[in-house]
Amino acid sequence: MKHTRMKLKTVVKNLHEGWKFRQARLTNWYPATVPGVVHTDLLQNKIIEDPFFRLNERGLQWIDKEDWVYETCFTLAADMMRKENMELVFEGLDTYADVYLNDECILKADNMFRCWSIPVRQYIREENNILKVYFHSPVKIDVPKWDALPYQYPASNDQSENGGLFNKKISIFARKAGDRK
């Protein structure tokens, strides 16, 4: 019996262009860089001062207490639309994020250290695909977890005090990169 091997060709479309972002409770959109982080987008759009200059960081502790929305629109070429399988791949969503494709929630992420691969063929259209990532504040998610415990976990590297959370060391609840201070 003779076996033949089919060579499958993977086609990749990077979605790094055309992103915008906003504070979830506000309506003003600003240009965003993806991949990136909200702090650099805020700085690039002159919404905040340089956090590394003098004591500016102290006045920027509100950022991680807010929810943020990132959005882009993309089109697929006709040959891509003929593909049987399509996946959307995220490498490092920080951290609590809901991902929507054309108003369908396709992912609820909770771990910055993993790659997320989501089958999306059923949600994709050739034009005007709207991809939205809603980033939840880790403070809003994790403070209730801390409050619910009758004891405290050790977290000597936690920066909660600097962020105005006093002794609520919430970093132990999130699969998220820590501050490098």
PLM region descriptions:
Residues 60-64:
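Short, solvent-exposed beta-strand/turn "edge" segments of beta-rich domains on protein surfaces
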Residues 25, 30-31:
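Solvent-exposed adhesion/ligand-recognition segments of exported proteins
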Residues 54-56:
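Active-site pocket scaffolds in enzymes
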Residues 4-25, 38-46, 65-181:
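Accessory beta-strand-rich segments of carbohydrate-active enzymes
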